Structures are given as C-alpha cells and as structure tokens.
C-alpha cells in the first residue's frame, strides 16, 4: 500500500478497513491487512482466528479489540481516535477499547502482514474493498459501512 503509519499517520487518528467476501476456516492463521514494526508496534485486521476477530490500530503488542466471530464475511474497521482510544466495527456491530499508541515503522500490506519488511500470514480471503485514513467516530464508521455495502451491492458482491 505504501502507507507507513510512522510517516503517514497522524498521532491519535488512524483507521483501516477491509471488506471480506469469503469466510475461511476458524483455525486458519491469516492476517488480512497490517504491519508490525520494531518493539511490536502493530496495525492490523485479523478477521477470523480461533473464531475471533482482532482489530488493532497503531498499538503496542496486545493492544487490540477482540470479539467472537464465526463468519469472516463482512466489513471490518479498526480505528484510533486518540492516543488511548481504539474502536472497531464488523458491519454495524461496534466495539471500543483502550490501548497505548505506537506507530508501526513499516508499510501496511493488504492480504498479509508486513513484519519488519517480510510478508507473513497470507490471507486467501477475497477483498472487495479496503481503506486507510484518519480516525473515524462511531457515526462515521456506520456511515462508511452503509456506503461500502451499497457500493458492493450495486456490483453484485455484497455479503451483509
């Protein structure tokens, strides 16, 4: 993507999103989008691992939101709106949490995680849409979900 959080992100304001058309198995080790830099600075979306979703936006290792997720199809957003506040969303279900901010110094990969310059945990899920940008409020995440779902429905590939 050429998006490097330590260079391109604004402190306390970042988001990533990923629209998955396929689900995959619960035990598959795949990371759908992300980067991990030195000192475990992480920015990643892990849609389904052990039937959970992990959403992490510019956090130190373990600074993620996790929730049960048995179907990987849908639209996922990981966001940071301050140095400590993180949020996330699957379709219209929202999650909140806190995590210390730490910007990854490696570019973000789509379809895998960039770990200190090496791609790993490749995903075989079909990506129908992805974004990277400034942090999103709860209302903005819901609006973005509506826009992206309508777009994918118009193309005959919506899954919500």
Model-predicted segments: where are they?
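Polar, enzyme-active/binding microenvironments
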Residues: 1-160
């Amino acid at each position: 993507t050429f998006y490097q959080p330590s260079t391109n992100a604004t402190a306390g304001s970042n988001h990533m999103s990923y629209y998955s058309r396929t689900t995959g198995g619960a035990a598959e080790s795949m990371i759908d989008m992300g980067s991990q830099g030195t000192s475990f600075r992480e920015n990643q979306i892990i849609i389904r691992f052990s039937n959970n979703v992990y959403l992490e936006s510019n956090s130190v290792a373990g600074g993620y939101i996790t929730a049960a997720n048995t179907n990987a199809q849908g639209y996922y957003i990981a966001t940071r709106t301050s140095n400590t506040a993180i949020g996330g969303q699957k379709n219209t279900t929202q999650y909140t949490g806190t995590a210390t901010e730490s910007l990854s110094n490696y570019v973000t990969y789509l379809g895998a995680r960039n770990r200190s310059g090496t791609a790993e945990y490749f995903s075989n899920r079909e990506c129908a849409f992805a974004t990277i940008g400034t942090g999103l409020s709860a209302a903005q995440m819901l609006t973005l979900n509506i826009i992206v779902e309508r777009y994918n429905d118009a193309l005959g590939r919506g899954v919500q």
